[in-house]
Amino acid sequence: VRVSPTGEFASVEEIGDVLIGSDEKRLVYLKDIADIVRAYEEVPSKMYYVNGRPALTLGISMQSGENVVAVGERLSRRVRELADTVPVGMELTQIYNQPVEVNNSVNGFVVSVGQAVAIVIGVLLLFMGLRVGLIIGTLLIMHLNGIELQRISLGALVIALGMLVDNAIVVAEGILVRMQGGMRAAQAASETVGKTIWALLGGTVIGILAFSAIGLSPDSTGEFAGSLFYVILYSLLLSWVTAISTTPMLCALLLKPGQNSEGGQRGPYAGVVFTVFRGLLAFAIRQRILTVVVVVGLFVAAVVGFGSVKQAFFPESNTPLFFVDVWEIEGSDIRTTREDALRVSEFLRGLPGVEQTTTVIGGPHERFTLVYDPREISSAYAQIIVKTDTRERIPEVWDKVEDYLQTQMPWTDPIIKSLRIGPGRDSKIEARLHGPDPTVLRQLSEQAQAIMRADPEAKDIRDDWRQPVKLVRPVYNEQVGRQLGITREELAAALRFAVEGTPVGRYRDGIRVLPILVRAPDNERADVGNLQDINVWSPVLDQAVPVAQVISGFETVFENAVLRSRDRIRTIIASCNPTGELATPLFNRVKPQIEALELPPGYSLSWGGEYEDSQKAQSGLGRSLPVGFLLMILTSILLFGKLRQPLIIWLTVPLAIVGITAGLLAANGAFDFMSLLGALSLIGLLIKNAIVLIDEIDQQVAGGKEGFSAILDATVSRLRPVILAAATTILGLIPLLSDVFFVNMSITIMAGLGFATLLTLVFVPTLYSLIFRIRPG
């Protein structure tokens, strides 16, 4: 038989039956001298409300490698099965359902990709004929199979769209022209592939290397967008393989040889468009110095104009959610914070378009997205998740709640922020001040905040130490304390017993373990003035004495409730947000003023916020970007075995900024991280087209054709493929203009590619004639 002297209580009532000794050597029941109750914490540590009603939250995360949509469907099915077991009066409400959001986002994006593919196929059918269009369109759809459906990988597929069709266009164009000249299908396919295989491979490899900085970037931004590089790697290599294998085979099967009455090479390019372009190109080459001067002038203007382009880091999410963070004065009771947070929540629910509010008081929500930035636990903090019917409704609700907080609750310190897609912070501009003395750091922070307040475009101005809190401190009388045998620790324990309660045991209730607290009655704890009457045991007198006998009195002081350090150095952050969308203009104004502050010896300043995030992302790219560009340059040199041809190609690359600047300024877009990816795509397209064109010129010159004629004929032969590749890419990006995540990237590629096409067809041959000293005639 097992003996188990656990001493556990079977019920709360049993606690009251515990016998304790008294001064009269008698035993009394605990329930005779104390009230024993089971209750919740008097001051909660955290509270949840959904639409103003008390709630409990359950967060569920997915295991790695699982399909989030499939997991969501299984969870929804299980929740429906458990609906009948929910107690009466309770209901299950979804705050954020990531599987649904992912499914909607991917489905919407797939529709956009489908529209883009349809546009691409339509353009090819219009300009290259039914059979060739069906060939390339079929190959394009083949590339879509097997690609994992998520935002970054689908974006990578759209970025690669122009490159995917370009390889097939070049091969199909060459075969079509040769067969129209009367050449047999097999011979036309063999000759076309033989002449273009290495140029296309070189262009494809360089296009892939343009994105290697993303895949090799070691920072969090590289991790977030790393799949983009691998999708482009696989899709472009596959496009090259199919362009030199499947495309010739299908062309040979489906295309019919034609008869060219002129019998020469110029027969397929004798149309009006080709003739006019030949004349314009000949004029540009004859006036090549003027052409170069004009292009260089446009480049200088674009570099200057790029300074006026808005700068951003990551775009915002499409999900119709945003956050309202409500900060009370530091040290506020959580119940006061709850009252104000519920007041804001009630106001929000009365606004048109607001479907749901979810409020947490005392700390952050469970982390429900990768980029959610949870705040620390604080009784002065509350966060409200606001769900609207559409994303377009957010600015209207945002403005109204911001005005309400400023006018009706001016004592609060609110932060309103959107749900981001990529990395980011609460404050876009952060000035970090480092030093040893908290008082000096607060003074420096106030100076920095004063500079921010002086700018009308700044809002949400604060520091992360927040306000000093009021503290009641007993002044221990050491002489009296020694005489009575009462130490500082015993004094603190007596005060803690009276105010908070002292844990003396644990009560097990099924699976719950509840603390047993002993504390003074409520009437003794309700008034600060009663603290001096609290008894503390004196071993010298062998009796309890009032706290007033051990202290000289109480003093009210202010102290820093929050002190933060960075790299083991005291650090305070003065921060703000712009009233508009972009932080860069405001940052550029306040940065020199804050840096002009006189810092005492031992104090320093550094910058955080979007500036630091952007610098880290660019630094991560900066460590891997040179390697990628070096490999691109080496590939172009090895491809030609000479230096002048790669020199022509790389002299044209910086000129892509002309189209980028013009497009972003005209569309009032911002150059963000996705725009950077679009620019890399643009570089790959530009280099690839230039490689194929220069390779064609070299082949014609090597075949004995006079230099000027070789440049004209080769460039005219590339007119249709280059324009088709550009048109398919530009038109294919139109559906993405409505997606906030890809809009700036789309503008960058569309505008940049338009000018890059002009560069390829006019400036590259002009530069070729200049560097190789080929004169007209």
Give the ranges of each region predicted by the language model.
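Extracytoplasmic/periplasmic membrane-proximal domains and adjacent transmembrane bundles
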Residues: V1-Q115, L125, A172, R442, ...
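Solvent-exposed, membrane-proximal periplasmic/extracellular interface segments of envelope transport
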Residues: R2-A10, R335-G424, Q479-G501
